Amino acid sequence: MLDIKFVRENKEVVKENIKKKFQDAKLPLVDEAIELDEKIRSLKNESGNLRAERNSSSSKIGLLMREKKIDEANQIKQRVVEINNKLVDIEKEEEELSLKLKKIMMTIPNIIDPVVPIGKDDSENVERERFIEPKTPSFPIPYHLDIIEKLHGIDLDAARKVAGNGFYYLLGNIARLHEAVIAYARDFMINKGFTYCIPPFMIRSHVVTGVMSFAEMDSMMYKIEGEDLFLIGTSEHSMIGRFIDTILEKDKLPQTLTSYSPCFRKEKGAHGIEERGIYRIHQFEKQEMIVVCEPEDSPAWFDKLWHYSVELFTSMGIPVRALECCSGDLADLKVRSIDVEAWSPRQQKYFEVGSCSNLGDAQARRLGIRIKGEKGNYFAHTLNNTVVAPPRMLIALLENFLHEDGSVDVPEVLWPYMGGTKVLKP
């Protein structure tokens, strides 16, 4: 969410940014926001003048009463009553206009970083760098579900009976590999200096609207019926929420957290859930990382975070690339985002396994996360990044380390988490 003062003073910049994101339908909102802001400031000025008049009049009443000027005192009393009634009306109107303005401001997208490529959708994202040269196997790679089923590692039919499409039972060594990936990712981030955290798996609505756009909220979040609670779509939401309405000391920054959580998503959108497989599902587990830092430090942290993801994947021998998200693919709160994609030998292309985002002060502004400064408090910057989402990591592992006989090599860094198991065999 942008500062209304910034919008007022940089109207054309804000409009040009909206155009870069191909959201021209939002252009009228800029003028509407400025108009509402002018009305609110006018009402504040009027109410300030009325309060000053009321205070002055109230001080006169006692003096007039002591001087036995009853009629004059009563006239002033009547004026004070009129002022109070007027203030009630003004405050009500100001509150209504402020709510309208807030809703509009939460719809206007954040200003994107100058390095972000301009494009309409993810088809125009730009490759930045590749890590580890992909290998083409001498035999055809089956679909990931077929690999897992041959390893007796999944029961989708039972899950479908229990919960419907978009869920699974993982079994045996596949379930163990899933947990090994999570445990390794946890230790990897702890060794990078991050504090390990297990957060709430449900959050209140004001936290939801503080961390994401209305469009994201509608397409992702499950609401608990009869409660002001939502199941988290990622632990970033509850980790950032930890700092709501907080004034942070400069010497306590940056705040770096890594967390494990189950994640729940409606996947209501263009992609939807996957009928057969574990790539796009309603429930999965994930290791996430977030940073709350000084504004000037967020670009450097952004580069660190996505490189951590690359380092994690390459430590397991998985080829990956970094893909810069274009303007039209960026969610409204994001300043910049890089997707990390793993190589799929079956498809002979890369697929998304994680995403790193710098949100500037958008989340901090919505949630009231400030830093204590010598000349007043100011908003922090927040960043988030996927450490690992095991369902997609499993696909990458199974495809890249599959042998023709159906066995799968376990990356060496995972051996300690697999009880020494080095190969998964059918």
Task: Label every model-predicted segment.
Residues 27, 130-426:
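TRNA-recognition modules of translation machinery and tRNA-sensing kinases, especially anticodon-binding
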Residues 1-135, 149, 153:
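N-terminal alpha-helical targeting/anchoring segments
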